[in-house]
C-alpha cells in the first residue's frame, strides 16, 4: 500500500500521540493535521498546540475544538437514558467519547482532503476497535493508520527512548516517572498501567484525581435536586443549565463527597481482562437520579423491557458499535420510553454515596390511594387479587399434578 500524503491524527499532546506524530512524519514523509478534542478533560489544551507546532505542524493544520456540549448532549445523555452500565459496574466513560472523536477525524479529513486518519490506541485495547469501527461506519473508504500495530516501539521504555532521541518533551509526575496511562473527559477519568496491572495490589491513593477519599469527604451530607425532561437532566436545584454545565456541576459535587470511584477488572472486546481505576463522580449521581425519576414515571412493562435490553445496548457502546443500526434501533426504543420521564429527584450525597430520598412528577404513575395501608375509599378491591392469583397459579397446579402422576408410575 502506498504511503499516505496527508493524515489527520487524533492528538492529545501526550507521550503516545506526540511520538506518533513524529513517526508519521519520518515513516511516511506525509503532511500531518492534528485534531485535539476538548471533552472536558480538565487540562489546558494550548500546550498541545505549542507541542504540535514544535513538531513541525502548520498552524492551519492544528485543530483544537471545544466539543463538550455536543459530547454530553448527543452521546452521554442518550446513553444515560438507557441507564447503560457495562458488566454491572462500568459507566462507559472512555467508550462513549470515541465515536465523537472519530466523527470529527473523518469530517476534518474531508475538509483537508486527507487520505487517512490515525489514532494512538494500542493493539491490545478496545479503543482501536472503537475508533476504527466508527470511522469506517462514517466513511467506508477512509484509511486508518494504527502505529501501535505497525511499529517496533512495543513498550513504554522504547517509547521514552524514541521521544528522547527526537527531543519530544515528556511530562513527569511528582514521583519522577512518566504518568499513568490516563484517559479523561467530562464524564470520567480512567487510570491504567504500572502497579494497576497487578489486580492483587490495592491501587495507591494518588491514582484518584477527581474524587476525594471517602475518609476525607465532608462529615455533613448535602442534599441536591435534579430535574429531568424526557429523560435528560435540565436543572440542578431549580437552576436551568446546559448539558455540559450540569455534568460539570455534578462532577464537582460528586468529587467533593467521594462519589464514583471504581476499581474494576473488565472483559475487553479483544478477549483479555484488564484492570482500571475509574472516577465518574457526576455520572454516578446522574445515573442514580435518572433511575429515581423513572421509578415513578415509567410503566412497569416498558421499564422491564428497557432493563432487559440495557446490557446489549451497553455492550454495543463498549465494543465500538455506536454508529451501528442495532444501536440506533435500541436508542429509538429507549427514547420512546422517556416521553414521560419528567420530574425532580432529591438526592443525599454523603461519604461516597448518592442516594435518592424523594422524587415527584406531574407525570407520576404512583397512586397513594392504591398502595396505602389506610382506608383507600374503594380505590382498590382486595378481592380482585383472588382471581388474579388463581389464573396465574393454574399452570403451576397443572405442572404439579402432572409431575405427581408421572412420579407415581
Curated annotation (Swiss-Prot):
InterPro entries: Arginosuc_syn_C, Arginosuc_syn_N, Arginosuc_synth, Arginosuc_synth_CS, Arginosuc_synth_type_1_subfam, AS_cat/multimer_dom_body, Rossmann-like_a/b/a_fold. ATP binds at residues 10-18, 37, 120. The keyword Amino-acid biosynthesis applies. Its EC number is 6.3.4.5. It catalyses: L-citrulline + L-aspartate + ATP = 2-(N(omega)-L-arginino)succinate + AMP + diphosphate + H(+). Its main location: cytoplasm. This is Argininosuccinate synthase. It comes from Ruegeria pomeroyi (strain ATCC 700808 / DSM 15171 / DSS-3) (Silicibacter pomeroyi).
Amino acid at each position: 500500500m502506498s504511503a499516505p500524503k496527508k493524515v489527520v491524527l487524533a492528538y492529545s499532546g501526550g507521550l503516545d500521540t506526540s511520538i506518533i506524530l513524529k513517526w508519521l512524519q519520518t515513516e511516511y514523509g506525509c503532511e500531518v493535521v492534528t485534531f485535539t478534542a476538548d471533552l472536558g478533560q480538565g487540562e489546558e489544551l494550548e500546550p498541545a498546540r505549542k507541542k504540535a507546532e514544535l513538531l513541525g505542524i502548520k498552524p492551519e493544520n492544528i485543530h483544537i475544538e471545544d466539543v463538550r456540549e455536543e459530547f454530553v448532549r448527543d452521546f452521554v445523555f442518550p446513553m444515560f437514558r438507557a441507564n447503560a452500565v457495562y458488566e454491572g459496574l462500568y459507566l462507559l466513560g472512555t467508550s462513549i467519547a470515541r465515536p465523537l472523536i472519530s466523527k470529527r477525524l473523518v469530517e476534518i479529513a474531508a475538509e483537508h482532503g486527507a487520505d487517512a486518519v490515525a489514532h494512538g490506541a494500542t493493539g491490545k485495547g478496545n479503543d482501536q476497535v472503537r475508533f476504527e469501527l466508527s470511522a469506517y461506519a462514517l466513511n467506508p473508504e477512509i484509511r486508518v493508520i494504527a502505529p501501535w500495530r505497525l511499529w517496533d516501539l512495543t513498550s513504554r521504555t522504547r517509547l521514552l527512548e524514541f521521544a528522547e532521541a527526537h527531543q519530544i518533551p515528556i511530562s513527569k509526575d511528582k514521583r519522577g516517572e512518566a504518568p499513568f496511562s490516563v484517559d479523561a473527559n467530562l464524564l470520567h477519568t480512567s487510570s491504567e498501567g504500572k502497579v494497576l496491572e497487578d489486580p492483587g495490589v490495592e491501587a495507591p491513593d494518588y491514582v484518584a484525581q477527581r474524587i476525594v477519599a471517602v475518609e476525607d469527604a465532608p462529615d455533613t451530607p448535602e442534599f441536591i435536586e435534579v430535574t429531568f425532561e424526557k429523560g435528560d437532566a435540565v436543572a440542578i436545584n431549580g437552576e436551568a443549565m446546559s448539558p455540559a454545565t450540569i455534568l460539570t456541576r455534578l462532577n464537582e459535587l460528586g468529587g467533593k463527597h467521594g462519589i464514583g470511584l471504581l476499581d474494576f477488572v473488565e472483559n475487553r472486546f479483544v478477549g483479555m481482562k484488564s484492570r482500571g481505576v475509574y472516577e465518574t463522580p457526576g455520572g454516578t449521581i446522574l445515573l442514580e437520579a435518572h433511575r429515581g425519576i423513572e421509578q415513578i414515571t415509567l410503566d412497569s412493562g416498558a421499564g422491564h423491557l428497557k432493563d432487559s435490553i440495557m446490557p446489549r445496548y451497553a455492550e454495543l457502546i463498549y465494543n465500538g458499535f455506536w454508529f451501528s443500526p442495532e444501536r440506533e434501533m435500541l436508542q429509538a426504543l429507549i427514547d420512546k420510553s422517556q416521553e414521560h420521564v419528567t420530574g425532580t429527584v432529591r438526592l443525599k450525597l454523603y461519604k461516597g454515596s448518592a442516594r435518592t430520598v424523594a422524587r415527584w412528577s406531574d407525570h407520576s404513575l404512583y397512586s397513594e390511594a392504591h398502595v396505602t395501608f389506610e382506608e383507600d375509599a374503594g380505590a382498590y378491591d382486595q378481592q380482585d387479587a383472588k382471581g388474579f392469583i388463581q389464573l396465574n397459579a393454574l399452570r403451576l397446579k397443572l405442572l404439579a399434578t402432572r409431575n405427581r402422576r408421572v412420579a407415581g408410575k
